[in-house]
Curated annotation (Swiss-Prot):
Protein name: ATP phosphoribosyltransferase
This protein's encoding gene: hisG
InterPro entries: ATP-PRT_HisG_long, ATP_PRibTrfase_cat, ATP_PRibTrfase_CS, ATP_PRibTrfase_HisG, HisG_C, N-reg_PII-like_a/b, N-reg_PII/ATP_PRibTrfase_C
UniProt keywords, alphabetically: Amino-acid biosynthesis, ATP-binding, Cytoplasm, Glycosyltransferase, Histidine biosynthesis, Magnesium, Metal-binding, Nucleotide-binding, Transferase
Matches recorded under Pfam families: HisG, HisG_C
Annotated source species: Shewanella woodyi (strain ATCC 51908 / MS32)
Alphabetical list of HAMAP family matching this protein: HisG_Long (MF_00079)
Source domain of life: Bacteria
Length: 299
């Protein structure tokens, strides 16, 4: 396949999305070897090039048509789109789907001694952030004026360093805020990782490959959310047992050798099978209950 037909995918070089992005692509059957000294990795089995770049470069690379796909946090994507619209630059891309990793929230936080009532408590104060556009949009909607302090990292130390009165930063568990004497006050944006596509993809072969990769991603994500359930059940309580299986659709029911009073049930559940459900199944006479993870799903 010619160089122009090779699919170019941008992912974060290092950081919280990097490992999960590579794990996802490998789960989709994309084989590649990463050389930490190189920014480009070529797939061994598919016409795909992997570009490892800074996360805040990914949206622009996709929007400008430099790469075809990007795996990025929704917060970074939204921040870049707002900035490009403000500068009247191309800001369109196709969001193919949200992914099941990279969950975080962009929140306002203030020092523990700060008497916070609502967002208006920040009127006229200085707020440190790496996401000035998302912060500005939120504060404008609230009708609050403030001064911003733009930092590319270590935002959480700004109040102690005397640089700002509060911060607007990404929060996962809140442990970093607590360690720096801060507490979370408002969530202004919730984010997951997502996969985006350039609006400029035109070659049929490349679009077909994108659809193949997306289908595999859908299968991997569905498999993570599903469990394969096997059990033996008395025929007299079969309907009750099937009704208890969460998210099960048309389970397979098979006869057991030399036992006309019991059957085997195989089912895919798209919900968690909790212990209390398993105990209810047991009360109805179910036995040999197995709940197993699924690696891949299709169809």
């Amino acid at each position: 396949m010619s160089e122009s037909n090779r699919l170019r995918i941008a992912i974060q070089k290092s950081g919280r999305l990097s490992k999960e992005s590579m794990k996802l692509l490998r789960s989709c059957g994309v084989k590649f070897n990463i050389n930490e000294q190189r920014l480009i990795a070529h797939s061994d089995n598919l016409p795909i090039d992997l570009l490892r770049v800074r996360d805040d470069d990914i949206p622009g690379l996709v929007m400008d048509g430099v790469v075809d796909l990007g795996i990025i946090g929704e917060n970074v994507l939204e921040e870049e789109q707002i900035e490009r619209e403000r500068l009247d630059k191309p800001a369109s891309c196709i969001k193919l789907r949200e992914l099941d990793f990279g969950a975080c929230r962009l929140s306002l936080a203030v020092p523990n001694e700060f008497n916070y009532e609502d967002a208006s408590s920040l009127e006229g104060l200085r707020i440190a952030t790496s996401y000035p556009n998302l912060l500005r949009r939120y504060m404008q909607r609230k009708g609050i004026t403030y001064n911003d302090c733009m930092l590319k990292g270590s935002v959480e130390v700004a109040p102690r360093a005397g640089l700002a009165d509060g911060i607007c930063d990404l929060v996962s568990t809140g442990a970093t805020l607590e360690a720096n004497g801060l507490y979370e006050t408002e969530v202004i944006y919730r984010s997951n990782a997502c996969i985006i596509q350039s609006s400029e993809v035109q070659l049929p072969a490349k679009q077909a490959l994108i659809e193949k990769i997306l289908s595999r991603i859908n299968g991997v994500v569905r498999a993570k959310e599903s469990k394969y359930i096997l059990l033996h059940a008395p025929t007299e309580t079969l309907e009750q047992i099937v009704a208890l299986l969460p998210g099960a659709e048309n389970p397979t029911v098979l006869p057991l050798n030399d036992d006309t009073n019991r059957v085997a049930i195989h089912a895919v559940s798209t919900e968690d099978l909790f212990w209390d459900t398993m105990e209810e199944l047991t009360k109805l006479g179910a036995s040999s209950i197995l709940v197993m993870p699924i690696e891949k799903m299709m169809g």
